[in-house]
Design a protein with these regions (language model features):
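Hydrophobic faces of well-ordered beta-strands that scaffold small-molecule active sites
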Residues: 7-12, 34-36, 75-79, 102-106, ...
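Active-site mouth loops of central-metabolism enzymes
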Residues: 9-17, 76-85, 112-117, 178-183, ...
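Active-site gating/metal-coordination segments in enzymes
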Residues: 47-143, 150
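Catalytic pocket-lining loop regions of alpha/beta-barrel enzymes
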Residues: 116-241
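Short, acidic/polar
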Residues: 16-26, 85-96, 190
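Conserved, mostly hydrophobic/aromatic
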Residues: 11, 26, 95, 130, ...
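Active-site environment of divalent metal-dependent phosphoester hydrolases
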Residues: 15-17, 41-44, 84-87, 110-113, ...
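Mid-to-C-terminal alpha-helical segments outside catalytic/metal-binding sites
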Residues: 1-10, 16-33, 37, 230, ...
Length: 289
């Protein structure tokens, strides 16, 4: 089992009190670093944030900022941006200058109106500001490859990362998008459309929640290996980033399951594992080892 020396997780969720716990598990698993998306689950939705006039939520990341300050070699973070925040440009500039602030995230896949806005250019002002400030942007907008293609063409200087394999799991599809579930063949055909985004050199793919999206266990992982092979063949290992989404795994798999299913994959060369399990993220986010 080949193992890269520098494993970096592209997405974990932690909140108050979670830094020491995350470090202990990372040390046990041999994970060198992780990108934090601070998002608290349970209680009030979308915490932490400041609530602005008109119901606009301004996400903040106090735990992630603290983690990056205390352990700059182990943690960096992204910041979510509300597309309706009137001060979005200032927030993006502040993140650009913040220690450990590496990227932005938007989530138009959370509701049908947001999906429609993404497809029709309603997020373009955020994309433009991200590109102007040199910040990569992760977008959670599953089942919407045409909207990603439009954005990639409109903003060729934007480093755009497709979240979570670019497709919904059926549970997310029926709840978030209010769409009917898809069979396995339909899901794979949709994923092929996502892979066509590899034609845009400014687009990368986050390999996260794959076990839920394709309904196959992360460990041992044999069912996912051919699908990941297709992704690497399309994008190249330099544009595929592994993410555990630790603490919010839809199938209840532990961090070790999610990592070791990748490490045990015989379809990836040692060099490809090095890229997918860390080097791609560091390269795209300008995060030195």
């Amino acid at each position: 089992m080949s193992r890269p020396a520098d494993i970096v997780d592209t997405q974990i969720h932690i909140g108050p009190g979670g830094i020491a716990e995350a470090l202990a598990q990372m040390d046990a698993l041999g994970i060198k670093a992780a990108l934090i998306d601070e998002y608290w689950f349970g209680g009030a939705p979308n915490k932490p944030h400041h609530l602005l006039a008109g119901g606009v939520q301004r996400p903040v990341a106090p735990t992630a900022e603290l983690a990056a300050q205390l352990h700059p070699d182990r943690f960096s973070y992204l910041l979510r941006v509300d597309v309706d925040d009137p001060d979005y440009a200032q927030i993006i500039r502040q993140l650009r200058d913040a220690q450990g602030g590496r990227a932005l995230r938007v989530d138009p896949g959370m509701s049908p109106p947001r999906r429609k806005a993404f497809a029709e250019g309603g997020y373009d002002h955020v994309f433009k500001a991200a590109a102007e400030n040199g910040l990569p942007l992760f977008a959670f907008a599953p089942d919407n490859p045409a909207a990603f293609a439009r954005a990639a063409k409109a903003f060729p200087d934007l480093r755009l990362i497709v979240d979570h394999c670019g497709v919904f799991s059926n549970s997310m599809r029926t709840s978030f998008a209010q769409l009917p579930p898809l069979g396995e063949a339909e899901q794979m055909a949709l994923f092929d459309s996502v892979l066509a985004l590899a034609d845009h050199p400014n687009v990368a793919l986050k390999w996260g929640h794959s076990s839920a999206m394709f309904d196959k266990p992360a460990w041992p992982g044999e069912g996912l290996w051919p699908i990941l092979r297709k992704a690497v063949n399309a994008f190249g290992a330099e544009r595929v980033m592994w993410a555990s989404d630790f603490s919010v795994n839809q199938r209840g798999e532990c961090w070790a399951d999610l990592l070791y299913g990748m490490l045990g994959n015989p379809d990836l060369s040692a060099g490809e594992k090095e890229w997918v399990l860390g080097k791609a993220l560091r390269t795209w986010l300008n995060w030195p080892a």
